[in-house]
Amino acid sequence: MPSLQKTKNRIALIDNIKKITKAMELVATSKMKKTQKHFLEVNEFSQSVLDIFSKIVSQIDPQIKLYPDGQKNSTLYIVISSDIGLAGSYNSNIFKILNSNIKNEDKLILIGQKAINFFSNRQDQIIETFKALPDYVTYKIAKLISDSALNSFLNKDVNQIKVVYTKFINLINQQEKISTILPIKKNPMKSEIKENAILEFEPDVESVFHKAIPLYLASIIFGFLTESKVSELAARRTAMESASKNAIDLIGNLKIEYNQTRQAKITQEISEIVAGSVE
C-alpha cells in the first residue's frame, strides 16, 4: 500500500512543476505574439527584396555566367536552431533532416547553442557559429551570417548555400525545411513586378546583380531567422501547454490514489478496532 505522505509529496512536487510549465507557456505566448508581428514585417521586406532580385536575374542573358568557376562540389548549410530546449521536437527535427542530407565534404554555419552542441563532432566542417540571438533578431545579425556564407561561396569553398530552418505554419504546426539560396536560378520565381515595367540598370544588369547579392542574402536569411524564432516560441508554448495538462492529469490520478489509500487505511483501522472489541 503506497505511503500517504509519499503520495502527498508527489502531488506537491508535480503541482510546483505545473506552475513552472504554466508560467513558461504564458511567457512563450507573450513573446510569440510580439515576435510574430516582427516576422510579418520582416517577411514583407524580404519578399520585396526577393521580388526585385528575381526581376534583375530575369533580365540577365542566359549565356552569362553569374558565379565563379572551379568551386568545390560542396554545400554550405546554415542551420538555425535554438539556444535552449523545452520546445518539443523543434531542434531534433532540424537535426534529423540535416543528417539525412549532409555529406562529409559539406560545411556548416551553426546558429543556436543546441546546433553547436549537436554537431560538436563535426568541428572540421564548421565555418562559424552564432548563439544567444535575441527574440527580436536584427538585420545586423543576418548580415554577419550572410557575409560569412557569401565569403565561402566566392572563395570557391562551396558551390551552393542552403538554409535549414523551421517554417511557421500556425500556432500548432511548424515544419522543418531546407531552402537553397545560392546559386540563384534564372527566373527563380514569378516576379510581382508588372511585366511591362521598364527597369534600367547602371552600368549594366550584371554589375547590379553582383552588387545586390549581399543585400539579397542578408534579407533572405533575416526572414528565415525571424520565422524560425516564431516557430521556436510556438513549439515551446505547445510543449509547455502539453506538460501543464499532463501535470493536471497526473495530479488528478495521484489524488484518487491518495484518497483510495486513505480510505483503505481507515477501513483497516476500523476493522482492527472491531476485531479487538469482539475479542
Curated annotation (Swiss-Prot):
One of its GO terms (cellular component) is plasma membrane. GO terms for biological process: proton motive force-driven plasma membrane ATP synthesis. One of its GO terms (molecular function) is proton-transporting ATP synthase activity, rotational mechanism. It is found in: Cell membrane. Belongs to the ATPase gamma chain family. F-type ATPases have 2 components, CF(1) - the catalytic core - and CF(0) - the membrane proton channel. CF(1) has five subunits: alpha(3), beta(3), gamma(1), delta(1), epsilon(1). CF(0) has three main subunits: a, b and c. This is ATP synthase gamma chain. It comes from Mycoplasmopsis pulmonis (strain UAB CTIP).
